[in-house]
Amino acid sequence: MVNEISPRTLVLLAVTCSLLVLYFSTRERQPVMPRELPVVKAKSYHFEDIIVEGRKKYPDRPYLAVNNRHSFVVYPPSCFDEIKRLPEHSASAKDFFHTMNAGDWTYVGHETTPLLKTIIADLTRVIPARVNKRQQDTRMAFESIVGYAPEWKEIGLLMTTFEIVAKINACAFVGRELGTNNKWVKAVMQSPLVIHVAVLIMNACPALLRPLLAPLAFLPTKMNQWDMRRLLTPMLQEDMAIFKETKDRSELLRPKQNGKIPLTAMLLSRYKQGEATIRQLIVDYILISFDSTPSTASALYHVICELAAHPEAADVLRQELDEVMVDGKLPQTHLQELKRMDSFLRESFRLHPVSLFSLQRVLAKPVKLSVGPTIPAGAIIAVDAAAINRSPSLWKDPDEFDMNRFHDLRQVPGNENKFHLLNTGSDSPGWGDGTQACPGRFFANSTLKIAFAYILQNYDVKRKEGSSPPKMTPLANGTWAPDDKAAALFKSRN
């Protein structure tokens, strides 16, 4: 007589079957790579050492870089222009960021065409008119976060720069009232942090269990989004009502010096009827806050680190500010007049990029470039940006910080419009390039220059005696995590 299956066994079988169904229905299907593509692999959670080895072994051809979590087909810098010309329907940057940040749970990579056009065109157009208002927002942010320091005061840089940028940008996007609301600022700061932690948890979890664990891992992300939705809804309802009642909507979109940037009106004017629901606008605001805050904060963090390491630069930069500013006000432009500051910022950006890579793309179709085999759909491709930023053939003493590097290069006849912080190209990989370049780089440029100008005018900055330069940590997706222990000494000048 056959023994009956116990209820406990049945439950165990049911759970196992459910896990298998979830796993096979949601797992990432890895593309089959061509055999002639060399592989550089290491039992490591990051790409740093893998890239160094790959660059040495295969300087002029692509290779497959494999760490414990991701596989990227890495192309040499010579392929930069080829990759930037690949259309989005063949090779997508949005899909890359969606994949790396679990976009189905976080919204990342869900940027709509109207949102991107709003950032590229409408937001960029209003930046010059907003400079002096954003100077006021910057003063408010620094006074509330750093404050007056009659004696040398140690400031932890990571969270300080994060909060400063979050406040400055929030005042522009959602207005001073909500932008100074600690609940909103905290939610903006929490957004990338809870996503990062959730992705780390998922990466460490066995693949079979990830579908089951995801709702729990991303619960803090969802709760943070609910908080942002609750705070945004009254403002958006008011904005939508004003837009609906206004006959001359071009007046709403006209660049103005005061008030918040009319981001809601910009979005409503670009969405088709029925698309611009309040839910869609909430997602757009969450995304623009996520996309604009951590990367700009990281750049400001490194700028302060370099200023602390090179305090002699401060007087040179202050003299330039004195020549450009009138009654304490910066010009209402994209601030290209600040040529030495621009050079300082670009040099910091060169030495301290966000990622080891540039032009990261997920392929929707097979792609064959001038070197290497055909790469199948589903693969992630990228350019070795570190090989550009630290190239001895491009830059003299590439591992050294030279605040005048790009200022001096622009003095060469024919270079007047080259080597700016905002420039994209094969010698400036930080913003990406082509039709999928960073759409918010003009806004980031403005934020950085206004914040840096405030620091130079109001504080002396130096390293703490005996401290070491910040130590960056490479992450699984190729990005760098700033040193959370880095600090600088601030002292008020007046």
UniProtKB/Swiss-Prot annotation:
Its EC number is 1.-.-.-. SUPFAM superfamilies: Cytochrome P450 (SSF48264). It holds the Pfam family p450. Heme binds at residue 438. GO terms for biological process: secondary metabolic process; small molecule biosynthetic process. It comes from the Eukaryota. PANTHER family: CYTOCHROME P450, CYTOCHROME P450 MONOOXYGENASE AN1598-RELATED. This is Cytochrome P450 monooxygenase ccsD. The gene is ccsD.
